[in-house]
Amino acid sequence: MQACADPRLWAKRRLMPLNAFQNTFAGNPLDRASDRRKDAAWLAERLASDQSLGMVLWNGKALVERSSSGGMQIAYLPSRLVEDLSGGPERLLFMGLWQDTAVFAVDLEGPADPTDGPLQGMGRFEDARALAASLPSGEIAIVGTAKGVFEWRRKHRRCSVCGEATHPTEGGWKRECSSCSAEHFPRTDPVVIMLAVHGDRCMLGRQEIWPAGMFSALAGFLEPGETIEEACARELFEEAGLRATSVRYHSTQPWPFPNSLMIGLIAEVDGDEAQPDQTELSEVRWYTRAEARALLAGEIKGSFAPGGMAIAHQLIRAWAEEA
């Protein structure tokens, strides 16, 4: 459905990433226009404008449609329809600007699929993980941004200071307590994810709860008072008994499941006698570069690595393809 003028210019005019490598969910092409979030009159005017666009999320899934080329794209609707669906500011989010076009999002919840009701014929809802392989990179980044903010908002309806109700302000990017006036902002949890290497081999581990045969890079949350390098070294030692001797940065990835920033690293370790802790890790395996490439290609029977949407896949590939 082409509900209103939809520039979709990012298909032709992409913002250049600051890093030469860009992970899935990174590269949001919208101008977040954070300076406009406090201007309630401007937001109301844009929300009512025929030129503004709206996107819809329902239980964390995004409304999408077929593009003219046969692929998938966000199903943008008139922003006034999105406002009507929202029932008020509690479920609305100002996403930003594409040139001078304002983009809003609405967060719907409940068991009834809106495409069986008010959104019938306007597209279908798809999970963000599934869309990572079918949406253009800029659009999946927009979906990830909306999903991450809405996940945070759902979990912070009560003030962490006094327990009273909070309400959204600044276009949905802040919540204020109605009682003590405490301010709450979207949460992002930093996670270090590292590929351990020794000589010409890398180490991958697996957890019992993962799909059978899946091996991946090790990861863990950054703790207060730690640097990225210190967190990397701690996680490697705690989970596998390995000591890091050097750490180099690869890239980062916003991960909206629910609110993480994955910090991708490659860590040299002092040996290959890994000892999985049997709590976080149940097994580890070492791979040469050729074996790692085969693992990524699905050529090792009974074993596989995370798919290309995951930063773990990109860490393995970057190391495996080094000269």
Predicted regions and their residues:
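Nudix hydrolase/Nudix homology domain
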Residues: 3-156, 167-168, 211-215, 277-323
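Cys/His-rich short segments
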Residues: 145-195
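N-terminal strand-loop-strand
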Residues: 175-217, 221, 243-244, 267-269
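The catalytic Nudix box helix
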Residues: 217-251, 265, 271-273
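Generic recognition of flexible, low-complexity loop/linker segments
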Residues: 251-253, 296
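Short proline/glycine-enriched turn/loop segments at secondary-structure junctions
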Residues: 253-255, 275-277
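A short, glycine/Asx- and small/polar-enriched loop/turn
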Residues: 257-263
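Solvent-exposed residues in well-ordered beta-strands and their adjoining turns
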Residues: 268-270, 287-288
